[in-house]
Amino acid sequence: MSYLRYYNMLDDFSAGAGVLDKDLFTEEQQQSFMPKDGGMMQNDYGGIMNDYLGIFKNNDVRTLLGLILFVLALYSPPLISILMIFISSFLLPLTSLVITYCLVTQMYRGGNGNTVGMSIVCIVAAVIIMAINVFTNSQIFNIISYIILFILFFAFVMNIERQDYKRSINVPIPEQYTCNKPYTAGNKIDVDIPTFNSLNTDDY
């Protein structure tokens, strides 16, 4: 006689018939190991397409726009760069933008003592704000600190504008447009100029 003739394996699982998936686990169990909804994009368009469409779900577009504005601010006139950094601060942290802008500007522009000093002040202020934000999450502090940091950054950019203006005034004149020949004042005509004493009136 076959073993299956007197033993039905489905009898041991009769209790599972009609039980829904949501009844098998508690809410805590589902949160611990069940897949989260919205964690990954459905593979409806293929793997490569999902990589491109995923930027709309992970704030990558926001970061990309902020970086584009920041790069344009680096190569724009100082006054326009203030506006671009201000817009970028809504997309990226202002502290990171200020630190990077000050470092890059000093690397390829250089500057005098005032510009270097203001860049150091802006960087130190941004680092302090970042450090305090680690221990506190006060929105009032963030607003006040960002206003102070933006004022310092504005003063730094205005120093750069003033420095560029002085450089434009003190542009050296090319040698081909300058006169390098020696010049001495005096009579340039190599002839004798008659005077009343040199006139001979005896002949008349």
Swiss-Prot record:
The UniProt keywords, alphabetically, are: ATP-binding, Disulfide bond, DNA-binding, Helicase, Hydrolase, Late protein, Membrane, Nucleotide-binding, Phosphoprotein, Transcription, Transcription regulation, Transcription termination, Transmembrane, Transmembrane helix, Viral envelope protein, Virion
Positions annotated as pro-peptide in this chain are: 1-16, 186-204
Q: Kindly list the residue ranges recorded as spanning the membrane.
A: 67-87, 140-160
What does the PTM comment state? The 23 kDa precursor is cleaved into a final 21 kDa form by the OPG083 protease during virus maturation. Phosphorylated on tyrosine and threonine. Its phosphorylation state is regulated by the OPG054 kinase and the OPG106 phosphatase. Phosphorylation by OPG054 kinase seems to be required to form the membranes associated with IV.
Entry GO CC: membrane; viral envelope; virion membrane
Query: What is this entry's stated membrane topology?
Result: Multi-pass membrane protein
Q: Which one GO biological process term can you cite for this protein?
A: DNA-templated transcription termination
**Intravirion compartment spans:** 88-139
Q: What is its main location?
A: virion
Superkingdom of the source?
A: Viruses
Q: Where in the cell is it found?
A: Virion membrane
Residues the record annotates as the site (Cleavage) are G16, A17, G186, N187
Positions bearing Phosphotyrosine = Y204
| Region annotation (Binding to OPG125 scaffold protein) ranges | 1-38
* GO molecular function annotations of the record: ATP binding; DNA binding; helicase activity; hydrolase activity
Q: Does the keyword Signal belong to this entry?
A: no
Kindly indicate whether the keyword tRNA-binding belongs to this entry.
no
Q: Which cysteines are joined by disulfide bonds?
A: C102-C122
Q: Topological domains (Virion surface): residue ranges?
A: 1-66, 161-204
How does the annotation summarize its subunit structure?
Answer: Homodimer; disulfide-linked. Interacts (via N-terminus) with OPG125 scaffold; this interaction helps OPG125 to associate with membranes. Interacts with OPG140. Interacts with OPG154; this interaction allows OPG154 to be anchored in the mature virion (MV) membrane. Part of a complex composed of OPG144, OPG153 and OPG154.
- Name the family: Belongs to the orthopoxvirus OPG144 family.
**What is this protein's function?**
Envelope protein which participates in virus morphogenesis. Needed for an early step in viral crescent membrane formation by interacting with OPG125 scaffold protein. Its interaction with OPG125 scaffold protein leads to the formation of rigid, crescent-shaped membranes that assemble around the cytoplasmic virus factory. Acts as a membrane anchor for the protein OPG154. OPG144-OPG154 virus envelope protein might be involved in fusion or attachment, and can further associate with OPG153.
Question: What name does this protein carry?
Answer: Virion membrane protein OPG144 precursor
